[in-house]
C-alpha cells in the first residue's frame, strides 16, 4: 500500500453528524458500476487518491458518507456523470416492450414512467432504433434498478 494513501473503511449513518464537527468533506464521484465494488483505489473530485476497504454489505449510494478508522478524512459519495442512452417510445406498451427486451439481455436500466436510461452501447442502440424507439445520448448520473440479484456484491 502507498504511504499516505487514505484507507476508507467505515460508513457513517446518514443521520450521524460528521465526526469531530468536520466541515471539510471531499466528494467521491463514482459510476453505477464503481458503486458496487467496495474495495480498491479511487480518486476524489479534488484529486486525492483513497483506498476503499469497506465491509461487504450493500452497494454504495449517492449520499453515503465514508471515513477512515481515525475519523480524520470525511468523504461523501456522489453519482458520477455517465454517457447514457435515453429511450422514449410513442406508447407506454412500446416502452414496456423495450424494457422487456433489455431485461432479457441483463442490461442495467434506470426506469422512469416515460423513459428508460441505460449505459451507451452501440449494439443496443441499433436494436432499439430498429424497434422504432426515440434515442437520445445524454450525460447524467445513472441509478439503475437493483434487479433480481440486488443482494449480490462484488469485492
UniProtKB/Swiss-Prot annotation:
Compartment list: Cytoplasm
SMART domains: UreE_N
Listed GO biological process terms: protein folding; protein-containing complex assembly; urea metabolic process
This protein's record includes keyword Cytoplasm: yes
Pfam assignment, any one: UreE_C
One MF term in the entry's GO annotations: unfolded protein binding
Keywords: Chaperone, Cytoplasm, Nickel, Nickel insertion
Subcellular location, principal: cytoplasm
Entry annotated with the keyword ATP-binding: no
GO CC field: cytoplasm
Protein family (similarity comment): Belongs to the UreE family.
Family annotation (HAMAP family): UreE
NCBIfam families assigned: PRK13261.2-2
Function per UniProt: Involved in urease metallocenter assembly. Binds nickel. Probably functions as a nickel donor during metallocenter assembly.
Protein name: Urease accessory protein UreE
Species assigned in the record: Synechococcus sp. (strain CC9311)
Upper classification of the organism: Bacteria, Bacillati, Cyanobacteriota, Cyanophyceae, Synechococcales
Amino acid at each position: 500500500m502507498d504511504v499516505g494513501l487514505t484507507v476508507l473503511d467505515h460508513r457513517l449513518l446518514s443521520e450521524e453528524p460528521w465526526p469531530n464537527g468536520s466541515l471539510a468533506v471531499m466528494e467521491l464521484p463514482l459510476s453505477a458500476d464503481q458503486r458496487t465494488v467496495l474495495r480498491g483505489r479511487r480518486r476524489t473530485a479534488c484529486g486525492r487518491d483513497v483506498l476503499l476497504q469497506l465491509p461487504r454489505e450493500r452497494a454504495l449510494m449517492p449520499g453515503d458518507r465514508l471515513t477512515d478508522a481515525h475519523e480524520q478524512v470525511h468523504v461523501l459519495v456522489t453519482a458520477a456523470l455517465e454517457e447514457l442512452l435515453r429511450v422514449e417510445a410513442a406508447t407506454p406498451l412500446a416502452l414496456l416492450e423495450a424494457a422487456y427486451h433489455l431485461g432479457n439481455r441483463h442490461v442495467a436500466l434506470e426506469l422512469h414512467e416515460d423513459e428508460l436510461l441505460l449505459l451507451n452501447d452501440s449494439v443496443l442502440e441499433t436494436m432499439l432504433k430498429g424497434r422504432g424507439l426515440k434515442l437520445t445520448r445524454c450525460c447524467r448520473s445513472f441509478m439503475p434498478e437493483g434487479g433480481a440479484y440486488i443482494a449480490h456484491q462484488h469485492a
